[in-house]
Curated annotation (Swiss-Prot):
Keywords of this entry: ATP-binding, Cytoplasm, DNA damage, DNA recombination, DNA repair, DNA-binding, Hydrolase, Nucleotide-binding
Protein name: Holliday junction branch migration complex subunit RuvB
This protein's domain notes: Has 3 domains, the large (RuvB-L) and small ATPase (RuvB-S) domains and the C-terminal head (RuvB-H) domain. The head domain binds DNA, while the ATPase domains jointly bind ATP, ADP or are empty depending on the state of the subunit in the translocation cycle. During a single DNA translocation step the structure of each domain remains the same, but their relative positions change.
Protein species of origin: Acidovorax sp. (strain JS42)
Name of the coding gene: ruvB
Subunit structure: Homohexamer. Forms an RuvA(8)-RuvB(12)-Holliday junction (HJ) complex. HJ DNA is sandwiched between 2 RuvA tetramers; dsDNA enters through RuvA and exits via RuvB. An RuvB hexamer assembles on each DNA strand where it exits the tetramer. Each RuvB hexamer is contacted by two RuvA subunits (via domain III) on 2 adjacent RuvB subunits; this complex drives branch migration. In the full resolvosome a probable DNA-RuvA(4)-RuvB(12)-RuvC(2) complex forms which resolves the HJ.
Region (Disordered), start-end ranges: 1-28
Length: 356
């Protein structure tokens, strides 16, 4: 059973929708994601190292009848951190309670969650790097000793009492592990970094999702969707749904390589998985800032996007694919970026392109 504590939290302001954004576009999309989500580790595709470690640690915890060590999952958005938290709870045969860092505004919010956990339950906190310091302080003794201190009363009559908690597992997820405080990071016994997926792994996910959606698809069509999905399952599933719509209206309903190509071209997703925002970023660095180095704030102002979105959502894939470099002096366009834009690289670039 999963209990969401943030179902009635205020909605964040709507973001500019990008079909290749790794963030969920809407609550409807989140519901569709849940329907496609694997339930067990053996159904989970990719992340072989993390999957193997979790399989061993979960098996050992079940044999001993103990709570699993606290788990930290980090990496770019859309790679399956929430999915893994659900799988961990399912594999352990316990309840999952789900919340997020921004929702836990006061110590009493966290205390209410912790005191309602049953033995060996899983508490999933998304965006755990956004916990407030006062809430984080309450969490430390809960993680180490399964105890919390709460204040009873007000003013001079106020007193602190210690409450014992049931053993539990905290699963924390973050896209920005560097923003976690050292005391919090050190309390996680299991730390797993989720990496971008390979096209072959994404193709397996696309074919599985197409089967669940009842969408006929060729292997070639599935691979084309996978290649343009930026290494991210959430994007792969979103593109699959868009291509399915195109196939039903413009074709016979069967997703072939040709249908996938035409649909993705209509969506302005190029063969590298780049969209307008990616190209705007590369063009800004190359044309407006002479290839860099250029600071993140200057890029954000140039393309009209928040610096946090660039750093968390747009940049990681460009860096991972070798189109952008992050240096101490700022962002620098690589030779691949110049080639992608069809622009001749500068000759005097500190030797960066001389060997190419």
């Amino acid at each position: 059973m999963t209990i969401h504590t943030d179902d009635f939290a205020p909605s964040p302001p709507p973001a500019r929708e990008r079909v290749v954004s790794a963030a969920p576009a809407s609550s409807q999309e989140e519901a569709l994601e849940r329907a496609l989500r694997p339930k067990l580790l053996q159904e989970y595709v990719g992340q072989a190292k993390a999957r193997e470690q979790l399989e061993i640690f979960i098996g050992a915890a079940k044999k001993r009848g103990e709570a699993l060590d606290h788990v930290l999952l980090f990496g770019p958005p859309g790679l399956g951190k929430t999915t893994l938290s659900h799988i961990i709870a399912t594999e352990l045969g316990v309840n999952l309670r789900q919340t997020s860092g921004p929702v836990l505004e006061k110590p009493k919010d966290l205390a209410a969650l912790l005191t309602n956990l049953e033995r060996n339950d899983v508490l999933f906190i998304d965006e755990i790097h956004r916990l407030s310091p006062v809430v984080e302080e309450i969490l430390y003794p809960a993680l180490e000793d399964y105890q919390i201190d709460i204040m009873i009363g007000e003013g001079p009559a106020a007193r602190s009492i210690k409450l014992d908690l049931q053993p539990f597992t905290l699963v924390g997820a973050t896209t920005r592990a560097g923003m976690l405080t050292n005391p919090l990071r050190d309390r996680f016994g299991i730390v797993a970094r989720l990496e971008f997926y390979t096209p072959d792994e994404l193709a397996r996910i696309v074919m599985r999702s197409a089967g669940l959606l009842g969408a006929p698809i060729d292997a070639e069509g599935g691979m084309e969707i996978a290649r343009r999905s930026r290494g991210t399952p959430r994007i792969a599933n979103r593109l699959l749904r868009r291509v399915r719509d195109y196939a039903e209206v413009k074709g016979s309903g069967h997703i072939t390589l040709d249908i996938a190509n035409r649909a993705l071209t209509m969506l302005d997703v190029d063969p590298q998985g780049f969209d307008v925002m990616d190209r705007k970023l590369l063009e800004a660095v190359v044309h407006r800032f002479d290839g860099g180095p250029v600071g993140l704030d200057n890029i954000a102002a140039s393309i009209g996007e928040e610096s946090g979105t660039i750093e968390d959502v747009i940049e990681p894939y460009l860096i991972q694919q070798g189109y952008l470099q992050r240096t101490p002096r700022g962002r620098v366009a690589t030779l691949a970026a110049y080639r992608h834009l069809g622009v001749a690289p500068p000759r005097a670039a500190g030797g960066l392109f001389e060997s190419a």
